[in-house]
Amino acid sequence: MAIERTLSIIKPDGVEKGIIGKIIGRFEEKGLKPVAIRLTQLSKAEAEGFYAVHKARPFFGDLVKFMTSGPVVLMVLEGENAVARNREIMGATDPKKADAGTIRKDFATDIEKNTVHGSDSVENAKIEVSYFFPEVQVHAYEWKKLA
């Protein structure tokens, strides 16, 4: 299996609920390790640039407003098939359609406040990771198994 990197964002609703540690724990329990992590407040320009692919969509303005409404946690996750695994752990975009035990089913409010973002393809993961993290800020390391 391929070792990949993917971008994960804990959105403002996840930060506000105080579940950052729970979310990171779920990724780690499923074999995805954070190799870069940062708590930040996105500017309007950063959010518009990151979500530019949705600019023509009717929800774009609300998405930018929400993503700049409070702090977010930006992470690069690394592991086998990280992109697909991350999406599986997050669950469906609409929490009402998400499987039990996924982050969105357990913590999200609605399709807008759905707690987390994850890259949707290996190609987009590379673009998204580089948008927020220059390579120098990403640190590879090996996990040591606890006895």
From Swiss-Prot:
GO biological process: CTP biosynthetic process; GTP biosynthetic process; UTP biosynthetic process
Entry-linked Gene3D superfamilies: Nucleoside diphosphate kinase-like domain (3.30.70.141)
Record-listed ATP binding positions: K11, F59, R87, T93, R104, N114
Enzyme Commission code(s) on record: 2.7.4.6
Alphabetical list of InterPro entries matching this protein: NDK-like_dom, NDK-like_dom_sf, Nucleoside_diP_kinase, Nucleoside_diP_kinase_AS
Molecular function, one GO term: ATP binding
GO CC annotations, alphabetized: cytoplasm
Keyword entries, A-Z: ATP-binding, Cytoplasm, Kinase, Magnesium, Metal-binding, Nucleotide metabolism, Nucleotide-binding, Phosphoprotein, Transferase
Active site per database record: H117 (pros-phosphohistidine intermediate)
One Pfam family this sequence matches: NDK
Catalysed reactions listed for this entry: a 2'-deoxyribonucleoside 5'-diphosphate + ATP = a 2'-deoxyribonucleoside 5'-triphosphate + ADP; a ribonucleoside 5'-diphosphate + ATP = a ribonucleoside 5'-triphosphate + ADP
Cofactor(s) this protein cannot do without: Mg(2+)
Enzyme class, broadest EC rank: transferase
Keyword Calcium in annotation: no
Family annotation (SUPFAM superfamilies): Nucleoside diphosphate kinase, NDK
Localization: Cytoplasm
Family of the protein in this entry: Belongs to the NDK family.
Alphabetized PANTHER family for the sequence: NUCLEOSIDE DIPHOSPHATE KINASE
Subunit description: Homotetramer.
Known role: Major role in the synthesis of nucleoside triphosphates other than ATP. The ATP gamma phosphate is transferred to the NDP beta phosphate via a ping-pong mechanism, using a phosphorylated active-site intermediate.
HAMAP family in the cross-refs: NDP_kinase
The protein, known as: Nucleoside diphosphate kinase
Organism field: Anaeromyxobacter dehalogenans (strain 2CP-1 / ATCC BAA-258)
